[in-house]
Curated annotation (Swiss-Prot):
Transit sequence range: 1-15
Signal found in the keyword field: no
InterPro entries hit by this protein: Ribosomal_mL49
Full protein name: Large ribosomal subunit protein mL49
Keyword Ribonucleoprotein: yes
A Pfam family of this chain: Img2
Keyword annotations of the record: Mitochondrion, Ribonucleoprotein, Ribosomal protein, Transit peptide
Protein location: Mitochondrion
GO CC list: mitochondrial large ribosomal subunit; mitochondrion
Primary localization class, coarse: mitochondrion
Its biological purpose: Component of the mitochondrial ribosome (mitoribosome), a dedicated translation machinery responsible for the synthesis of mitochondrial genome-encoded proteins, including at least some of the essential transmembrane subunits of the mitochondrial respiratory chain. The mitoribosomes are attached to the mitochondrial inner membrane and translation products are cotranslationally integrated into the membrane.
GO biological process: mitochondrial translation
Amino acid sequence: MRSSLKPVLSNLRFNSTIASESLRFHVSRTPSKNLPVYLDYKQRGTKILTLIRKIHGDSNALRLRLISTLKMSPKDVYVNKLTNQVVLKGNHIVTVREWLQDQGF
């Protein structure tokens, strides 16, 4: 006879913690438990972009929070609506990863 297995919440493991109920976005971790923050080189390496992937929820809220906390110009941070990625002009990979970890992701 088959016994029905019901998942118990205490037995489940999550890839990342939920930072706060007030956040309107969530950044999931990769399968290797890393934050999905990457560098992208354009125009033969002369243009460097920082990409934040795996955003669930309001990516524009993440953009606005990054602008205010990292003191960046609003024209240097934008959302790619097609891929749902936040793009920052320049190499900000270390500061973005530290900020995401401080937020609980």
